[in-house]
Amino acid sequence: MFKDEARKSLLQKRQNLSQTECIKWDDLLLIQFQKLDFSNIQTIGSFYPMEKHNEPNTILLTSYLQELIPDLIIAYPVIDKAFGTMHFYEATDELVLNAMGIYEPNQNKLIPSNDIDCFLVPLLGFDLLGHRLGFGKGYYDKYFSTCQNPCQRIGISYFEPIPNIQDTHEFDVPLTHCITPWNRYEFK
């Protein structure tokens, strides 16, 4: 399946989810998430879920990690549309809604890419090789290419993988893991 076709199909499928389904599936995602190894995690890059896109509730996941790792630093991305880049800043209680409808932290404390041990990665879908299907802007792939230290890249998906994304590019950075409400996937 090609990215544009898959993106359109999966976005529609996710938009058709009821609030009840999302809440139930978020709980199931948390169960799968709790089975992953976070023993070496000190800083996590996450994202604030966009309700208008029925994104999985990452707040449940990061709250679990905060209980597991009391000194955990959580960072959220700030997007610079003019340069097509993003950077992660330490998350605070005060988030600001940007022009794209994404909540971002204030930009007081930049977290260098090499300091982030694990990322929760937004996506519409993924394939059996760990290729991620996002919204098509390439922000995450560009950012991941700046990470020199090994890090976990965990996709969070309501849906099982599609067999194959046919039009991947050499600059696409694959996930290391992905969770769905029913399964965990690990990619090499």
Label every PLM stretch briefly.
Residues 82-188:
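Conserved phosphate- and dinucleotide-binding cores of soluble alpha/beta proteins
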